[in-house]
């Protein structure tokens, strides 16, 4: 009887842990780039990192926000670039909920604003991340 009870509790605990992982909601910011980057690409990189690591550091600490910098010239980066159909510098802000990804391509916005209108770029990026977490 003790073995049965232990087995049942172990199974339930295991199932509950899996359910927690499956319902995890977070935002993942992906910045793709090649070996050579223009001034605008560098601005997107710099200001995205500032938003994620400084302005929204608490979300990173809580696991609600993740950042990945992907060099598409590496074998590992090539695989991700193929998955996202990326062939040059790109910025994605994606929501993950219940194991499903909602992609948001912010590349055009980044190129329009990161270098020439930094304040707008950072403000909109923060707003996008916060909206996706609601």
Segment roles from a protein language model:
Residues 1-23:
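Bacterial Sec-dependent N-terminal signal peptides
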Residues 93-134:
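Non-catalytic, surface beta->alpha helical segment in thiol-disulfide oxidoreductase systems
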Residues 23-54:
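Local sequence-structure signature of Cys/Sec-based thiol-disulfide redox active-site neighborhoods
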Residues 75-98, 105-107:
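Structural alpha/beta surface segment adjacent to cysteine/selenocysteine redox centers
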């Amino acid at each position: 009887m003790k073995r049965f009870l232990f087995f049942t509790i172990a199974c339930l605990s295991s199932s509950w842990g899996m359910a927690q992982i499956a319902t995890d909601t977070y935002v993942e910011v992906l910045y793709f780039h090649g070996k050579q980057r223009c001034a605008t690409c560098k601005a997107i990189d710099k200001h995205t990192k500032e938003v994620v690591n400084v302005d929204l550091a608490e979300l990173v600490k809580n696991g609600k926000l993740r950042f990945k910098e992907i060099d598409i010239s590496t074998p590992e980066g090539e695989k991700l670039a193929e998955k996202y159909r990326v062939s040059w510098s790109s910025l994605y802000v994606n929501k993950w909920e219940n194991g499903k990804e909602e992609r948001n391509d912010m590349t055009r916005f980044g190129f329009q604003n990161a270098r020439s209108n930094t304040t707008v770029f950072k403000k909109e990026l923060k707003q996008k991340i916060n909206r996706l977490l609601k």
